[in-house]
């Protein structure tokens, strides 16, 4: 069993807070998801999440124009600089103050950030002559605003910066001190916070947008004075312009009139003159400036639009809403959605892998069920029929049907081909179901209740209630069917485990006593053992046949449990969450993964009863329970100061409003407290492919995998990738480097030279170390090159080595390799056909050679029989259908891969049989 699992992706959350941004090519969208950053590839339909984590939720992110450096800053002002291509953290830095915005300059030399009421300009880390990576170097600090800065914008020539602030003003700043006279301007006149300020495409105008819906157009014009009439025409023709006589003045004023809705976010695309505005009502509008013509007006819902971004060409607009976790990419010219995703509003309760491991289903407290694609990371479908919290989900064996249980008293069956609810199961009375199990045949579904402690059994075909299994004296916590003999195992809070024979005649069940309440249960895939997690923090393993305990794992010391804000004692002395609430067997039965209401996921080796690896769920200090020690400065006799609700001190009215119902605090907590989400893991499950497992947590759906799917080009940032250096690497027998550099340069003659120069004995080693990003191009090259090449064996060795080393990755990413694999298939078909034709054309020559040898007369008779049989089969070859159709190929004698080949052997009958088997195995 592999134990080298690493974090690979985060599903279930697409946007949390902060700004979103496009890459320079417009193909990728970067979105902050809590304390991580997710990247959505809008062209290739896939996504990934960076492995690094912040200590708090991310407040601002930006990507430089070259697409190589990503900077992200959290709520406390701690920044992380990341190599975007390699996904490696390069530098940590603390700005020691909250940052509301960060932007790279268009030329990439500098980046500016809004730190409180100060504008800081820093030099972008770069590679100097000595090739040493330099840390952050501050270039300039500008002070002038009286309140916090809300946004900043660079000019296209990277000389000036526009900032907006809560002091109802905007300012223009120069990067260099020589031009400070040109930029010493303050834009006043707005009556509310200025949300954005932008340069026009020719930089002759400046647009400022305020929160109350006012748009001012500023132009750099000459000041009116009494001396203007006395100026001569010669003075007007002077080349030198006296800048002191010019100033920025308001030439036009426009208003949105959004029915009391405030402007929440705004962006402007200078090339297309497109202004995109998001409002607190969930509405967003598109305007054409400077005419202020309304182009489109749409809505995302009733929640505020928190951020908006536009790509480089101005065709796509991205909107984010943090209330429901919505992310939207809209193409305004065609009025169509490029991406429309939404995460779970509430915490996730359960997850289930599809039998092929390509999809995963999550169930949430909000009553919704979402189907996620593992490869792309996108949500495929959402089911909203449940009216209460969904407690469990599970697939049928074939993966086309899914079942779910809910606290609304129903168990529903879902068709994942038509995406509809085709069956609803209910009990004789209204009860709540909290666990679910499906028979391997898919004919019976069982659910355990919280109210009457019974296990209800339904027929999937008829939808009728078949039986109610009683015997438990407490709520049924977990159910599981055996995959071999359809035995049902149930666990309960009454400290017992019961093994039920659903299809047997006898329903007498002897309970297996456990020393504590059973919280979770998992049955080994072979159905011989069952593992349970108890309230005492132990995982006990029982043999099903003789009901004896065969193993016990003490997990209390392996669990990482932090201190909560409302705790009066330390985490070390706390009994909170010192147990696992969900466990799952690996498919070989050698390992168990476990999680609970704590900050750890543990992987155990079952035979040796030891901990293999422990994973930290989240390092986000904004979650309750991630810290082992609390800040003593905030601890008082009444509790932690973090519990005090300071929402009434917010500047925005919508943030100060108390949304609690009148009288809802009666009999409860009479003081206003601020509650933070708790870190927890509600469900874990291994993937059927055995190379990954998923965990449903507070942060979302965490995917841990053993596959290194990072597509990093190691030569992308190297300036020495030249044809000369490629030939030099080949001469020094650095075959892998030479091959990758040749594909990096994309010179056909160079690729051919390097490819043919690699020795046959080195091919397996080179093929096993090729970066995954180059696999489609190399396979496509071999498929096209081999058709015209005479090196048949050489090309086949390359194909075998590549498929052996990367077959799993190719199978998981079929959409990337479809073209390349068709080219290779065409080459293999032609080779096989040529071999068969050569054998057929030479069979009479072989017969003549055999007949001249007197010592082989007996064998010749046998050969004649083979030839006669072969000739008889030739008449039937025309009626056989081939799986692969070759273009412009009319030669006879080829019978396809599915045909039976009875051709004459070249040496003896044994070799012939071997060749027949090999030809049948050809794909």
UniProtKB/Swiss-Prot annotation:
Gene Ontology cellular-component annotations: 90S preribosome; cytoplasm; nucleolus; nucleoplasm; Pwp2p-containing subcomplex of 90S preribosome; small-subunit processome
Keywords annotated in UniProt: Nucleus, Phosphoprotein, Repeat, Ribonucleoprotein, Ribosome biogenesis, rRNA processing, WD repeat
Domain of life, source organism: Eukaryota
Location, primary (coarse class): nucleus
WD repeat spans: 12-52, 53-93, 94-132, 144-183, 189-228, 258-297, 300-340, 343-382, 385-424, 428-470, 471-510, 513-552, 575-614, 676-714
Annotated SUPFAM superfamilies: Quinoprotein alcohol dehydrogenase-like, WD40 repeat-like
Renumbered residue ranges of the record's region Disordered: 653-674, 869-923
Name of a matching Pfam family: WD40
A biological process from GO: maturation of SSU-rRNA from tricistronic rRNA transcript (SSU-rRNA, 5.8S rRNA, LSU-rRNA)
Composition-biased stretches (Acidic residues): 869-893, 911-923
Location of this chain's protein in the cell: Nucleus, Nucleolus
Gene Ontology MF terms: mRNA binding
Flavoprotein listed as a keyword: no
Disulfide-bonded cysteines: none
Residues where Phosphoserine is found: 225, 232, 651, 664, 912-913
Family listed: Belongs to the WD repeat PWP2 family.
Oligomeric form and interacting partners: Interacts with snoRNA U3. Interacts with MPP10. Component of the ribosomal small subunit (SSU) processome composed of at least 40 protein subunits and snoRNA U3.
Further comment: Present with 16700 molecules/cell in log phase SD medium.
Function text: Required for bud-site selection and cell separation. Also involved in nucleolar processing of pre-18S ribosomal RNA.
Protein's name according to its UniProt entry: Periodic tryptophan protein 2
Organism of origin: Saccharomyces cerevisiae (strain ATCC 204508 / S288c)
Lineage: Eukaryota, Fungi, Dikarya, Ascomycota, Saccharomycotina
């Amino acid at each position: 069993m592999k134990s080298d699992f690493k974090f690979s992706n985060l599903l279930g959350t697409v946007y949390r807070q902060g700004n979103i941004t496009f890459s320079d090519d417009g193909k990728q969208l970067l979105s902050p998801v809590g304390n991580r950053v997710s990247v959505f590839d809008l062209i290739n339909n896939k996504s990934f999440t960076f492995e690094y984590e912040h200590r708090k939720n991310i407040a601002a992110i930006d990507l430089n124009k070259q697409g190589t450096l990503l900077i992200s800053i959290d709520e406390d002002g701690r920044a992380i600089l990341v190599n975007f291509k390699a996904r490696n953290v390069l530098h940590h830095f603390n700005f020691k103050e909250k940052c509301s915005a960060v932007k790279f300059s268009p030329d990439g030399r500098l980046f500016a950030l809004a730190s409180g009421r100060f504008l800081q300009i820093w030099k972008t880390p770069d590679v100097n002559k000595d090739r040493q990576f330099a840390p952050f170097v501050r270039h300039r600090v500008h002070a002038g605003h009286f309140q916090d800065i809300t946004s900043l914008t660079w000019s296209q020539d990277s000389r000036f910066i526009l900032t907006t602030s809560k002091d109802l003003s905007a300012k223009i700043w120069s990067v260099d001190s020589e031009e400070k006279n040109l930029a010493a301007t303050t834009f006043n006149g707005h009556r509310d916070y200025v949300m954005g300020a932008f340069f026009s495409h020719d930089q002759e105008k400046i647009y400022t947008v305020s929160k109350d819906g006012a748009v001012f157009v500023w132009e750099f014009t000459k000041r009116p004075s009494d001396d203007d009439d006395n100026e001569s025409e010669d003075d007007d023709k002077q080349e030198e312009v006296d800048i002191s006589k010019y100033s920025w003045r308001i030439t036009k004023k426009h208003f949105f009139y959004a029915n009391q809705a405030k402007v929440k976010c705004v962006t402007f695309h200078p090339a297309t003159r497109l202004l995109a505005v998001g409002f607190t009502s969930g509405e967003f509008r598109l305007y054409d400036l400077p005419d202020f013509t309304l182009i489109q007006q749409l809505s995302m819902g009733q929640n505020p639009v928190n951020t908006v971004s536009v790509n480089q060409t101005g065709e796509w607009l991205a909107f984010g809403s943090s209330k429901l976790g919505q992310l939207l990419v809209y193409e305004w010219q065609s009025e169509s959605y490029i991406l429309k995703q939404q995460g779970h509003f509430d915490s996730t309760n359960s997850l289930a892998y599809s039998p092929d491991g390509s999809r995963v289903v999550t169930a949430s407290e909000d009553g919704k069920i979402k189907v996620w694609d593992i490869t792309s990371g996108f949500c495929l479908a959402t089911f909203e029929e449940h009216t209460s919290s969904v407690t469990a989900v599970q697939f049928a064996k074939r993966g086309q049907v899914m079942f779910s249980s809910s606290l609304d008293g129903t168990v529903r069956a879902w068709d994942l081909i038509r995406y509809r609810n085709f069956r609803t199961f209910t009990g004789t009375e209204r009860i709540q179901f909290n666990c679910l199990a499906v028979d391997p045949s898919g004919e019976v579904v069982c659910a355990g209740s919280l109210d009457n402690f019974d296990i209800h059994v339904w027929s999937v075909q008829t939808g009728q209630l078949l039986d109610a299994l009683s015997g438990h004296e407490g709520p049924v916590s977990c159910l599981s069917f055996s995959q071999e003999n359809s035995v049902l195992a149930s666990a309960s809070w009454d400290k017992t485990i019961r093994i039920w024979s659903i299809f047997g005649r006898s329903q007498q069940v002897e309970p297996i006593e456990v020393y504590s309440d059973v919280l979770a249960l998992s049955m080994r895939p072979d159905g011989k053992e069952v593992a349970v997690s108890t309230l005492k923090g132990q995982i006990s393993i029982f043999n099903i046949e003789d009901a004896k305990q065969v193993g016990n794992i003490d997990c209390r010391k392996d669990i990482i449990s932090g201190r909560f804000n409302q705790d009066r004692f330390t985490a070390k002395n706390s009994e909170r969450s010192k147990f696992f609430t969900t466990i799952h067997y690996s498919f070989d039965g050698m390992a168990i993964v476990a999680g609970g209401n704590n900050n750890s996921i543990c992987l155990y080796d079952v035979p040796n009863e030891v901990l293999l690896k422990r994973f930290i769920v989240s390092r986000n200090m904004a979650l309750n329970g991630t810290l082992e020690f609390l800040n003593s400065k905030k601890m008082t006799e009444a509790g932690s100061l973090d519990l005090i609700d300071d929402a009434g001190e917010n500047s925005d009215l919508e943030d100060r409003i108390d949304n609690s119902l009148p009288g809802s605090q009666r009999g409860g907590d009479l003081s206003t407290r601020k509650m933070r989400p708790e870190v927890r893991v509600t469900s874990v499950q291994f993937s059927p492919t055995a190379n990954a497992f998923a965990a449903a947590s507070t942060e979302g759906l965490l995917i841990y995998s053993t596959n290194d799917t990072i597509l990093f080009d190691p030569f992308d940032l190297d300036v020495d990738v030249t044809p000369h250096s490629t030939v030099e690497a080949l001469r020094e027998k650095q075959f892998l480097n030479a091959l990758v550099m040749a594909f990096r340069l994309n010179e056909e003659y160079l690729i051919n030279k390097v490819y043919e120069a690699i020795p046959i004995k080195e091919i397996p080693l080179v093929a096993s170390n090729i970066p995954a990003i180059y696999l489609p191009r190399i396979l496509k090259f071999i498929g096209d090159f081999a058709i015209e090449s005479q090196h048949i064996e050489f090309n086949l060795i390359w194909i075998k080595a590549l498929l052996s080393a990367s077959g799993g990755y190719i199978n998981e990413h079929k959409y990337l390799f479809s073209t390349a694999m068709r080219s290779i298939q065409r080459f293999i078909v032609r080779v096989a056909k040529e071999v068969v034709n050569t054998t057929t054309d030479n069979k009479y020559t072989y017969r003549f050679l055999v007949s001249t040898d007197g010592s082989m007369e007996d064998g010749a008779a046998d050969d004649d029989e083979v030839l006669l049989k072969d000739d008889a089969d030739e008449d039937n070859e025309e009626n056989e259908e081939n799986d692969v159709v070759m273009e412009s190929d009319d030669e006879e004698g080829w019978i396809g891969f599915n045909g039976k080949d009875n051709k004459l052997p070249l040496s003896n009958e044994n070799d012939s049989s071997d060749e027949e088997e090999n030809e049948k195995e050809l794909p």
